[in-house]
Every structure is written in structure tokens, then in C-alpha cells.
Amino acid sequence: MGYGSGVRLLSFLCLFLLISIGCRAKDYSLLHPLRPSPGICRESEIFDCGQVRIHWVAYCLDQRGLLPGVLIHPDAGGVAEDLEGICLDLARHGYFAAAVHYQRLENLREKNPLIGCKSFEEGSIAYRHLLEHPRVDHRSIGVLGFSKGGTHSLLLAAIEPGIEATVAYYPLADFEEWLDVSQYSFPKSLRFRAMRRHIMKELKVTTWEETLPELRTASPINHVARIHAPVLLIHGGKDHTVPVGQSERLCQALKAGGESCELFIIPKAGHVFNFRNEDQARVAWEKTLEFLDQHLKR
């Protein structure tokens, strides 16, 4: 199975992440409110490449000179505009920060489809766009993502050697392990069994074993040999959607391969904690800025 099938599966599984997270509201501006900001430029753009429509929102200082760039991917329920406050905050700290999400040209009725990119080449379009931006120093680019966007960022780091720093909040790192129903008690095991049946139907296979090549392709933990940028993983210690063990194993694998990885655990936090708890969000964001400054501002 190739990278394209892995991205298709990754997008499909995000449906179940949404189900697992539940209906509790998220506040994307909780720590990052949009306020008038003199000296900050905003740009927005919608452009097509192949069968993908990219929605792009970016902020940067209104001054001359190249800036380190950060590409930001939202969680499964978010769009680029939801992350404008984060982009604005990064711009105030001296970054060119762009948030993106994707649509399919064959079905523009869906604002933010689960399957936005059907190949890793499509998933790299926004990164290449950032790379070519006249305000961005192409030698200092990082990626940042939340949940689905964190997984996307890790996979980008595996296929784009120019990425200098990766920050992934509560990412799914190993789909095969996450979908192993033997670790779950009733009734949670029923939900994961149903999930497996849906995946088999989507992939048009009759046995679970036939899904494993795609699960492995979509899992960042199976690409650690290709991730050379320093990685910061931020995870809630009480995350019941994507357990912190996912990030623990990924970090261990990266370190075992001689790569730089740091795992920062917020002890009592759950999934998407930074859009629900301001105090937890602040601690995580301070760590994020410290990491990006260390690796992108040289």
C-alpha cells in the first residue's frame, strides 16, 4: 500500500475521533482571542491544486525581511479560520504563521471533508506554498497540528526533509495499536469493533488483517526513520480519546533511532484540552513557543 491509501485511511478514521471526542464545545479563541493588532498583516487565500482546494489564512509582522514560518493544521472538527488567533499570536512572536484546511473539488458542498487529501503529495501542497512565500525563510519552517492535524504534521515531517521543527498536540501515532479491541473493556470495545467493521467496509476487504498495511502506512510511528526534525509531543495525561501512551511510544521510537523528541504531558488534561481549559492551554502554549523559538529562530 502506498502513501495515498494511508492518507485516505487517516481522513476516514477522523470521523471516529469526532465521535469519541463527543459534542462538548471547543473554544479556539480561548487563549488566542482575535484583537486589533497594529503592525500585523493578515492575508487569506483560496487556491486549487489538482483536485484539492486549499483554504489559507496567514498573519505576519508588517515589516521587511524574512521570517521563520509555521504551518498549522486544525483538528478534525476545525477549519483554518478557527486558528486565526493562534496565527496572530505566532505573528506577534515574529513568525509567519499560516493555518490551512482542504476541500475536494469533486464535492465542494462539504466545507471541511474528512477526506481532504487523498495522497501525501496532496497533503504537502500547503507546505510547498509556504516554502515559496516571499516573506518566509525557507530554511526555518516548522509544522504545528492538533489531533488529526498533529498526525498530519508528523507525516509531513517524514516526507518533507526541509521541515526544521514539528509540534504535535495529542496525535494518533499508531492506528493499529489504537484499534486493537483486546485492550478495551465493555462498552468501549463495542464502539471499536463497530469502527473496525466500518473501516473494512470502506476499504472493501473481508478480513481485519487486510486493513493492516493501510493502518501502518497512516501511522507516524512507522515512519520514525524518516523524521529528522526535532519533535515536541504535547499530550493530556487523562486523554481518553487518544491515550498518552500513543505519544509515549512514538517518542521512545524516535529517541531509539537517534532523533530528538520531547514529550510534554499535561497531567489532568483530556483530548483537545487547549481549546477547553485556559490554564492548561497556557502551559502548553508556553512550551510550544519555547520549542519553536529554539529550533526556528537562529
Model-predicted segments: where are they?
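Alpha/beta-hydrolase fold nucleophile elbow
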Residues: V136-F146
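Conserved alpha/beta-hydrolase "acid-adjacent" motif
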Residues: H240-Q246
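C-terminal catalytic histidine-bearing segment of alpha/beta-hydrolase fold enzymes
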Residues: E248-R249, G257-R298
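Alpha/beta-hydrolase active-site loop
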Residues: P113-P134
